[in-house]
Amino acid sequence: FFFKQKTAYEIPKRDWSSDVCSSDLRLKTDNPGSTAFMQMRVDEALRAGRPMRLRQHWVPLDRMAPVLRQAVLVSEDAKFWDHDGLDYDELRISIQQDWARGRLFRGASTITQQLAKNLYLSASKTPTRKFAELLLTRRLEAELPKRRILELYLNLIEWGDGIWGADAAARAYFGVPASDVSAPQAALLAGAIINPRIYNPSRPSPYLLRR
């Protein structure tokens, strides 16, 4: 479908905290049809003079291949089940390296942090945006079970130009639903998350194969 309307989950600049509270409650049971990050990509496409066709097929976590879920956790957030949304060791290293460089560079984002960014924020690397991400991350962890956070993440993560979520990615790159992804396919899909608009799981680069 072609997406042009403003996403219901995009936070206005005024009084964003109350909007987050209400949307967090909806996220317990409702599957968002769009996110702020999706809207950002749509806006980029419109400015470039091309429509953005979004491909996304929402599937429950239990209908995603276990090897795919595990591959994403290993690649993106090995401590997911144990932390409270933030990996403090990685966060400390990130702050130290960013301070040395004089700018925000290193990601060190957990799955919950990435979900917070995708739902509500932009991709900009500014201290203000990063601070908002940390606050939103803690709120998501407080309001949602871990399995729901993982389900939301796997259905909303960007996996290529106009490709969102595990099922759309599995079908686009390998012609199978997320439930039928093999272990090698899962590894390639997980490895591409780091930069999904560059790395193509169906035509993996040497770097992606190493990941």
Question: Where is each model-derived feature located?
Answer:
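Juxtamembrane regions of bacterial inner-membrane/periplasmic proteins
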Residues: 17-211
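Single conserved hydrophobic/aromatic residue that forms the stacking wall/gate
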Residues: 1-20
